[in-house]
């Protein structure tokens, strides 16, 4: 469960290490974002020769949360931390690699590219 001011690790090779959620997209009164939701983020920590720089604003999709996601069969999948993948303005991933597992809930039309790049789909 991600809200404004939440810090997330970045699960791709864009060069960003940590981002800060500055807005949950999808309605004026929307407070929380879960797995598969799009948020607006600011880069707080970046590698020196990365594709993105500190202070830049991007869209991102949440791929892992510590809160987890409940499946239809009653099972619950949780992760150790919160992670996101940076997106461009067309909502396509900026990076060319994804690190760590992602969940099956991302298998919508919009995020099939992320699912195909991920090393493991839970």
From Swiss-Prot:
GO terms for cellular component: cytosolic large ribosomal subunit. InterPro entries: Ribosomal_uL14, Ribosomal_uL14_bac-type, Ribosomal_uL14_CS, Ribosomal_uL14_sf. It comes from the Bacteria. Gene3D superfamilies: Ribosomal protein L14. Keywords: Ribonucleoprotein, Ribosomal protein, RNA-binding, rRNA-binding. One of its GO terms (biological process) is translation. One of its GO terms (molecular function) is structural constituent of ribosome. The keyword Transport does not apply. Binds to 23S rRNA. Forms part of two intersubunit bridges in the 70S ribosome. Belongs to the universal ribosomal protein uL14 family. Part of the 50S ribosomal subunit. Forms a cluster with proteins L3 and L19. In the 70S ribosome, L14 and L19 interact and together make contacts with the 16S rRNA in bridges B5 and B8. This is Large ribosomal subunit protein uL14. It comes from Burkholderia cenocepacia (strain HI2424).
